[in-house]
């Protein structure tokens, strides 16, 4: 069981610094931007437009990274059967998408491994703003334990601490912890797995929040100026002493009677539309450029004229950023399956987590056709299994190999 004072220090520091930042990032993804909380000027129109680049950046990244799902490969048929069973029971594709979404928004994600009454391994994503990793101080820091806190329906806060052997539950009130219970979990390691988006644990749109705020202000000011233009003042000179009745008659009859040197004109603000549109285009371009994301609405990407190679070239910076996320995601998936294998092996199984290979496939248009063409060219050079594993339309290489053998057997019988 971990030291209560140390747990409180980590809990207090996280609530003071990390939790507000992560909450703000999630709010931006949901469209709750700072411009909505800006002070109001009672003398001006108050349009506050949210241009949600954050959701666009995250949804494009998650779709590109996880749109075709994750596949696994192993030379052991029993291990592949176990992976298929556990993945199906846990709706793994949904979990992986949720983790990728948290990575893109918050720069970090977490999942909890547990087992149900039938001792079937389960994994569930946790909210990043309520989970605290605690590492040792070695050259290669290892996870000592993880803290999870949440509020119950009665308003009380519960703190759960997971280490390599046990889970301890505490009540948290007025800055103090009261220990309730400790139970073993049998995973052989800390059953909370952390996922990193990059080395700095930064979200995908976090570096461009100031640009997004600037675009929101510019767009809102443009609409406010247009509204001011619609409500502009009418200046009348040479009409003599006009009273409210005269002004009412002008509005009703739409006729103004002026002296010889009289004049009527609107007082309007000159708006440089070209400058504003150029500024908006520049800021929008900087948002996509500095976030390492491609604007999918660009004319060069909107059509179907580009080949797969040309599209990949246009997506190079985007791919570089996603590749970093993939490296960290792969390590965390390896930890997930290692612990699942360790738990199942306690019941007499002999699964090898190191023998599980993770295969990521980008969600690109035209990819299946190009992959099929490449598979045909590699036929006879690589083994049939290796070729099949890299076809994005095949989720289970073993099942596909079995179907091929069955079809070949039927042909021979005929």
State what each model feature region is:
Residues 110-200:
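Extended, regular secondary-structure scaffolds
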Residues 282-414:
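C-terminal helix-loop subdomains that flank or include functional centers
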Residues 1-122:
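Extended, helix-rich architectural segments
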Residues 18, 32, 64, 68, ...:
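Short secondary-structure junctions and interdomain/linker hinges
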Residues 180-310:
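Extended, charged amphipathic alpha-helical segments
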Residues 80-83, 264-265, 313-315:
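A short, surface-exposed helix-loop junction/capping segment
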Residues 75, 79, 87, 91, ...:
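Short amphipathic alpha-helical segments
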Residues 2-18, 237-238, 403-414:
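Leucine-centric amphipathic alpha-helical interface motifs
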């Amino acid at each position: 069981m971990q030291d209560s004072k140390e747990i409180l220090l980590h809990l207090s520091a996280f609530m003071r610094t990390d939790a507000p930042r992560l909450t703000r990032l999630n709010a931006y993804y949901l469209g709750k931007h700072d411009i909505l909380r800006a002070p109001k000027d009672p003398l001006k129109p108050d349009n506050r437009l949210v241009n949600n680049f954050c959701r666009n950046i995250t949804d494009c990244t998650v779709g590109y990274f996880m749109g075709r799902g994750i596949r696994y490969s192993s030379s052991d048929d029993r291990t592949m059967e176990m992976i298929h069973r556990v993945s199906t029971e846990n709706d793994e594709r949904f979990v992986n998408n949720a983790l990728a979404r948290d990575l893109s928004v918050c720069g970090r994600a977490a999942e909890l491994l547990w087992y149900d009454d039938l001792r079937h391994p389960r994994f569930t994503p946790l909210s990043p703003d309520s989970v605290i990793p605690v590492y040792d101080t070695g050259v290669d820091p290892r996870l000592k334990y993880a803290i999870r806190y949440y509020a119950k329906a009665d308003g009380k806060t519960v703190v759960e601490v997971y280490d390599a052997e046990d889970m301890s539950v505490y009540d948290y009130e007025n800055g103090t912890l009261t220990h309730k219970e400790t139970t073993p979990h049998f995973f052989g390691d800390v059953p909370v797995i952390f996922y990193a988006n990059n080395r700095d644990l930064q979200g995908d749109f976090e570096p461009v929040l100031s640009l997004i705020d600037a675009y929101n202000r510019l767009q809102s000011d443009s609409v406010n100026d247009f509204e001011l233009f619609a409500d502009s003042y009418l200046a009348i000179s040479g009409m003599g002493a006009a009273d409210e009745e005269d002004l009412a008659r002008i509005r009703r009859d739409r006729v103004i009677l002026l002296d010889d040197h009289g004049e009527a004109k609107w007082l309007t603000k000159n708006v440089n539309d070209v400058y504003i549109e150029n500024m908006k285009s520049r800021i929008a371009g900087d948002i996509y450029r500095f976030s390492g994301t491609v604007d999918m609405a660009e004319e060069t990407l909107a059509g179907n004229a580009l080949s797969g190679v040309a599209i990949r070239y246009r997506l190079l910076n985007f791919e570089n950023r996603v590749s970093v996320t993939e490296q960290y995601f792969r390590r965390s998936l390896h930890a997930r399956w290692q612990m699942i294998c360790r738990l199942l092996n306690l019941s007499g199984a002999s699964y090898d987590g190191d023998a599980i290979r993770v295969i990521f496939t980008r969600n690109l248009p035209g990819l299946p056709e190009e992959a099929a063409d490449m598979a045909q060219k590699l036929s006879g050079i690589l083994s049939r299994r290796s070729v099949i594993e890299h076809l994005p339309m095949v989720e289970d290489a073993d099942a596909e190999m079995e179907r091929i053998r069955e079809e070949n057997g039927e042909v021979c019988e005929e």
